[in-house]
Amino acid sequence: MLHRNVENFIGCDSSYRTASIVLYGAPFDSTTSYRPGARFGPAAMRHESYGLETYSPYQDKDLTDGNVFDSGDLELCFGSSESALVDIESRAAEILRDGKLPLLLGGEHLVTLGAVRAAVRKYPDLHIVHFDAHADLREDYLGAQLSHACVLRRCHDLVGDGRIHQFCIRSGDREEFHFAARHTDMHKFDFTGLTELTDWLCQTDVPVYLTIDLDCLDPSAFPGTGTPEAGGVSFLQLLGAIRTVKKANIIGADVNELAPMLDQSGVSTATACKVLRELLLALEK
């Protein structure tokens, strides 16, 4: 049984027993390749969420009407990526075992791998829907295979060809794009093709893990991230994508790569909070 976090995300006041969605944080950024600070993302989102209403006019739903439990942040070893991933996998597996949807707050994008390891053990036919500026398909980064630059490559090791669906991708090296052409379903620059994919996911009813790297957003709207990339989507485009893909059989999700200290205006944290609110409401069945 998980116990309540001291400061939970606004509106996430259900007990663990009654919850259908469980938030858990992974404050980890030890493989960051450019600007660190994503480890502070989960705490910042919880704290700043109290400047946000629980009600969404976009969806006419309120967090207080749902069943979300915030279990707080994991205590992770910054010196060992594998140790951190084992802890994340263990928490995700516990939540899945109890019949609830785990929603992970990063942290850098590598944390997704721990959650996907747990998900694919329970759902061997898992598909991954990935919103990101970066392909994250490197075999290794500076010799490290466990890096935020390699996370979708490691996920591919688990799920295989044709089960990773990537959107908004606008950055990566040549080998990553060549790998994607052979092994993943990549949609560059925006969400073109998401409606058709979602229709297929719904028809087949395959289990889906949704991973959202917030740097899919344009840095004019979301500068507070470790590796910003010009040419991203707007908040409203991301919201539309969430509301589209929610129709699929989503069994787990994450939101990652907010580095709050890199945006002293607080706009990035406020945006991340709003994305999380809309995602929570969309996933409430």
Model-derived regions, located:
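Conserved alpha-helical scaffold segments that buttress catalytic/binding sites
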Residues: M1-K285
